[in-house]
């Protein structure tokens, strides 16, 4: 099984993608390290934070490492927001959403541009080019099922809350699945 875990290098904000054999306890801790809640995690002498700041998720490396041309992207953080956030809590929540969605939006735009260029130029010569050209990206958005959660919910590890999240995830998956699953998304 192939596994990718990303962390953000604090020094320059670059994404670090760790593949299966390079994944350690420190890498996993860094990949979820929110700097306002925990100090940076040291990996080989360099401090790292949550990978979501630089790649959320690292789609292009995932496509490059994958053996399939189909990727299912499950998006938990809302991209759209109605109304103007006014209170400190609302503003903080929306800023967090924008911050963690920005890398994904940039990667999806880059993939779209690459697919357009590859289509114009014909058969790509690189392995990654061929993978991008044939990529079928399916998008399951769970934002309608998690948007009402407070920012503090990321710290909630109670079993009842976790099973509630699981149930919401299942509802989002059921809404996404249809007779056309795998054909159109």
Question: What do these predicted regions represent?
Answer:
Residues 1-18, 40-44:
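Patatin-like phospholipase catalytic region
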